[in-house]
């Protein structure tokens, strides 16, 4: 069967701190075109690789990878809330297959996800519940982080499993590209924030969640005025990364350490490993070609914003 892929940056700042209307129209047009291509493909199953931002995963237990056998989106920053339509038996079979391939994949029957999962489903499929989905969390902010090599191997294992299903499979990678918004770090946290990072942040009071969101919005507004206030975006790195993906050279990223990536492009750039997993997965279906490449640095969203599709040729 055929597979399709789309990787897309996300930002909680969409609708809160937006770029000029012409830029917004351009991005919306790119997303609309991707949505049309996906609709024409008519996926029967979605595999969504996405990160978390201390909304569902915490330091009480922080896996490098986790497959949601059941998952619920919390609706942060105005994103869609509700249950994701996970096919339980298929998710369980996927977990077993990945484990047998040598990848230690955690599973959760009550995975809590945020805008990192919700936005791509909203933007590209029109909602959380449109197509059965296997949601795969990849840790992109909480050290110690998985590296490129292990993430690639995860994608390959999931790709091999889904290639046996006789279904039209859509792989989505969500996050990146270069960026470093104000995300708390355990090593620098005060007592209150440390408690939140250790797990109490899973059920934040509404007032505290609003304050947290406002801090991100304020940081974006300052970044627009002075891009020295946060780690700068890195369009050169972002475009080099997208070229590696397009050329099927993702294995070259194995040599890039987590420390090097953080220094080059920002500490939240590790979200791009969702793109690596997606491209590794589609490779299990045979030859593919990329299409629909788009990139623009958008300071208002504190992100090097990218969009890239691929389709199998067999």
Swiss-Prot record:
Please give one Gene Ontology molecular function term for this protein: 3-carboxyethylcatechol 2,3-dioxygenase activity
Active site per UniProt: 115 (proton donor), 179 (proton acceptor)
Q: Which Gene3D superfamilies match?
A: LigB-like (3.40.830.10)
Could you say which EC number(s) this protein's record lists?
1.13.11.16
Q: Which UniProt keywords apply?
A: Aromatic hydrocarbons catabolism, Dioxygenase, Iron, Oxidoreductase
User: Which pathway?
Assistant: Aromatic compound metabolism; 3-phenylpropanoate degradation
Pfam families linked: LigB
Q: Which InterPro entries match?
A: DHPP/DHXA_dioxygenase (IPR023789), Xdiol_dOase_suB (IPR004183)
User: Which cofactors does it use?
Assistant: Fe(2+)
Q: What class of enzyme is it?
A: oxidoreductase
Question: What reaction(s) does this enzyme catalyze?
Answer: 3-(2,3-dihydroxyphenyl)propanoate + O2 = (2Z,4E)-2-hydroxy-6-oxonona-2,4-dienedioate + H(+); (2E)-3-(2,3-dihydroxyphenyl)prop-2-enoate + O2 = (2Z,4E,7E)-2-hydroxy-6-oxonona-2,4,7-trienedioate + H(+)
Record's keyword annotation contains Transferase = no
Q: Name one GO biological process term.
A: 3-phenylpropionate catabolic process
The protein's matches in NCBIfam families, at most eight in alphabetical order, are given as: PRK13370.1-1, PRK13370.1-4
* Reported function: Catalyzes the non-heme iron(II)-dependent oxidative cleavage of 2,3-dihydroxyphenylpropionic acid and 2,3-dihydroxicinnamic acid into 2-hydroxy-6-ketononadienedioate and 2-hydroxy-6-ketononatrienedioate, respectively.
Q: Family, per the entry?
A: Belongs to the LigB/MhpB extradiol dioxygenase family.
- Assembly and oligomerization: Homotetramer.
Record's protein name: 2,3-dihydroxyphenylpropionate/2,3-dihydroxicinnamic acid 1,2-dioxygenase
Q: Which organism is it from?
A: Escherichia coli O81 (strain ED1a)
Task: Point out the gene that encodes the protein.
Answer: mhpB
């Amino acid at each position: 069967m055929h597979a399709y892929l789309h990787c897309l940056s996300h930002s909680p700042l969409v609708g809160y701190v937006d770029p000029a209307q012409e830029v917004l129209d351009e991005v919306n047009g790119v997303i609309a075109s991707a949505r049309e291509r996906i609709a024409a493909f008519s996926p029967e199953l979605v595999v969504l690789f996405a990160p978390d931002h201390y909304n569902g995963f915490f330091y009480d237990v922080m896996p490098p990878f986790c497959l949601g056998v059941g998952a619920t989106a919390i609706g942060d920053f105005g994103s869609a809330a509700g249950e994701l339509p996970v096919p339980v038996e298929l998710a369980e079979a996927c977990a077993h297959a990945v484990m047998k391939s040598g990848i230690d994949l955690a599973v959760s029957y009550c995975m809590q996800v945020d805008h990192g999962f919700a936005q791509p489903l909203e933007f590209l499929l029109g909602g959380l519940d449109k197509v059965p989905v296997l949601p795969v969390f990849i840790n992109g902010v909480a050290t110690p982080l998985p590296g490129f090599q292990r993430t690639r191997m995860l994608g390959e294992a999931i790709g091999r499993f889904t290639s046996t299903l006789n279904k039209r499979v859509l792989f989505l990678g969500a996050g990146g590209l270069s960026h470093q918004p104000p995300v708390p770090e355990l090593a620098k946290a005060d007592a209150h924030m440390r408690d939140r990072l250790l797990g109490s942040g899973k059920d934040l009071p509404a007032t505290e969640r609003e304050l947290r969101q406002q801090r991100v919005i304020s940081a974006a507004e300052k970044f627009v005025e002075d891009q020295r206030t946060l780690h700068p975006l890195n369009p050169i790195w972002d475009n080099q990364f997208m070229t590696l993906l397009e050329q099927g050279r993702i294995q070259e990223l194995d040599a890039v350490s987590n420390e090097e990536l953080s220094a080059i492009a920002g500490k939240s750039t590790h979200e791009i490993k969702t793109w690596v997993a997606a491209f590794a997965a589609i490779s299990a279906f045979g030859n593919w070609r990329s299409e629909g490449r788009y990139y623009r640095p958008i300071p208002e969203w504190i992100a090097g914003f990218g969009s890239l599709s691929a389709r199998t040729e067999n």
